[in-house]
Amino acid sequence: MNSITVAELKAKQDNKEDFQLIDIREGYELDICQIGGEHLPMGEILENLDKISKEKEVIVHCRSGKRSAAVINALETQYGYTNLINLEGGILAYAEQIDTTLSLY
């Protein structure tokens, strides 16, 4: 499984690179903090496969990186995705290293 650090994600955002960012956390978690991208809750991923690009890099994140890793593993093994990247440490790492104004939970 491919992964990316929060510093690498921030550089991509700053450089306005073309990629898709997907947040798979639950709605109540987005109310606490978010870093942008599309919201596709983990439990709704399979019914929203058409919203996940197969052409460009797709960075998937959750709170800590565990749920996103599980989703990526399933999408790669069951649906043939090859362009998915897990955000190491999830939004917790982003809040600690990039934007300390984000609320932790």
Name each model feature, range by range.
Residues 1-20, 24-57, 66-105:
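Rhodanese-like catalytic fold shared by cysteine-dependent sulfurtransferases
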Residues 61-62:
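Short, surface-exposed ligand- or partner-binding patches at beta-edge/loop junctions that are enriched
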